């Protein structure tokens, strides 16, 4: 399949998924709170792509949720090109993807994160994943969440869940705190074995995320919570901020490729605390 077609298919899927996820979120909010939409362009002097980020704040369920789509292209800086696969052979790049970060009002509902992307340099690959960060322990939620991920992965390859869970556990870890960010999930990168199969798996991950976040929210958003639990939530958000600013690949990639700062930092919670 021609690379132009691959890019178009990936780009169209990510944009469609943005619409689907935003619609689901607004339905959960009973359409009383809707997304603010902002389009942006990369590069002031030439067409280098751009994207659209959508933010919904102060809802009955979501304190802040961002759903970002982007399609950008251009040339890596000399300093950055050697850090990206294929960048040493061809400094030109194209990248498209969707990123979702949810910070909930109720401390019983965990923060949730999802992203998938397709990047092309001298060759192309998929990356992405999803993870959940509760501030209050819930072993039954953890077991259910990982079982859902395993079922989705097993539709494509029996080895994916174990492999991508391990990768997620290693990736979403704060070395300076010596603690994981949350209860894990799946994470994959540089996926380029078979384009059609890889793309099918990426679509599966996206639909699974939509179903998972809906189920978790409906189970938990009406539970009563205390001021103490809110304090725990705010401290846990502080850890979330630390990871995203210090270690997150997407944040680094966006800032190094002149992405939209507001869209890149949409993952940050509206309120957080440190002790």
Segments predicted by a language model, with ranges:
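Gly/Pro-rich turn-and-neighbor structural signature
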Residues: 2-85, 191-246
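A generic structural motif
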Residues: 6, 104-106, 122, 132-139, ...
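Internal mixed beta-strand/loop scaffold within catalytic domains of large alpha/beta enzymes
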Residues: 51-128
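Short helix/loop capping segments that flank catalytic or ligand/cofactor-binding pockets
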Residues: 78-80, 109-111, 138-141, 253-255
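Glycine-rich, often proline-containing surface loops adjacent to acidic residues and nearby aromatics
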Residues: 94-96, 125-133, 179-193, 240-242
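Long, contiguous binding/interaction regions
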Residues: 104, 251-275
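Compact, glycine/acidic-enriched structural inserts
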Residues: 122-166
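Long, charged, mostly alpha-helical binding arms that flank functional sites
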Residues: 151-201, 216-218
């Amino acid at each position: 399949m021609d690379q132009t077609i691959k890019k178009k298919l990936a780009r169209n899927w990510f944009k469609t998924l943005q619409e689907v996820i935003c619609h689901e979120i607004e339905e959960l909010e009973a359409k009383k709170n809707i997304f603010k939409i902002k389009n942006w362009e990369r590069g002031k002097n030439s067409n280098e792509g751009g994207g659209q980020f959508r933010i919904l704040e102060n809802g009955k369920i979501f304190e802040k949720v961002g759903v970002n789509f982007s399609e950008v292209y251009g040339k890596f800086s000399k300093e950055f090109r050697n850090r990206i696969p294929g960048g040493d052979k061809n400094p030109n790049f194209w990248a498209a993807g969707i990123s979702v970060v949810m910070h909930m009002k109720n401390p019983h509902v965990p923060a949730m994160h999802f992203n998938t992307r397709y990047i092309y340099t001298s060759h192309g690959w998929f990356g992405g994943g999803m993870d959940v960060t509760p501030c209050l322990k819930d072993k039954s939620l953890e077991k259910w969440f990982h079982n859902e991920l395993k079922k989705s992965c097993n539709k494509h390859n029996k080895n994916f869940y174990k492999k991508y869970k391990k990768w997620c556990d290693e990736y979403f870890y704060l070395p300076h705190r010596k603690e994981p960010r949350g209860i894990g999930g799946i994470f994959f990168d540089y996926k380029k074995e078979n384009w059609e199969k890889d793309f099918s798996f990426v679509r599966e991950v996206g639909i699974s995320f939509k179903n998972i976040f809906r189920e978790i929210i409906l189970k938990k958003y009406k539970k009563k919570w205390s001021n103490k639990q809110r304090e725990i939530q705010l401290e846990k958000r502080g850890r979330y901020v630390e990871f995203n600013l210090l270690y997150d690949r997407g944040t680094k990639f966006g800032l190094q490729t002149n992405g939209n700062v507001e869209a890149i930092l949409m993952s940050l919670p509206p309120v957080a605390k440190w002790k």
